[in-house]
Amino acid sequence: MPDMQYENAARAAGHTWVCGIDEAGRGPLAGPVSVAAVILRADFSLPGLDDSKKISAKKREELYHQLIEHPAVWWAQVEIDAATIDSLNILRATHQGMAAAAMNLQQKYQITIDHCLIDGLPVKQFPLPHQGIVKGDGKSLSIAAASIIAKVSRDQRMAEYAKEFPQYGFERHSGYGTKQHLHALHLHGPCRIHRRSFQPVAQLSLPLDSH
């Protein structure tokens, strides 16, 4: 289970504002990458908080609402859309989202973040001091909190897109390459939220605005 060891170590080293950052949605064929940045106060406590991939959708939803309403949680969330992903590539788009989430968090609460904990490897040219923590969402509570906010926010966005593009079933697979999604892609072609740099979407050469 994640805990506050990384956050506490950063504070012991003299850092005041320690921020956890994580993303959701790097792999899907459609929709945005969602990135959240979270600061947890030292006295933060929320039983059951874990890596978003290890808990049920219902539990994630419960934890999401508890987190965003928690007095000891400061957070910000951003989305990088499919067009930007296609323009930059998925890795650079994700890194852009991480930087934007941290900057939004600073602006939202009028603070200066002095240390970030990022899920995964360190990010080149990141605008703030940081460390990468491989599988950090299972080790750091602030990264775990960010993973839940990023994931649930993205699922909510994909449910909205499902109403706009009902033929794809986004509410069921959130844009991932399931059998149902692939069948719909071949039947209807891609829509404007599909990532045209991703296979097999790239193979379907229909005009961008045809659906």
Please provide the spans of the model-predicted regions.
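RNase H-like, Mg2+-dependent phosphodiesterase core
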Residues: 1-211
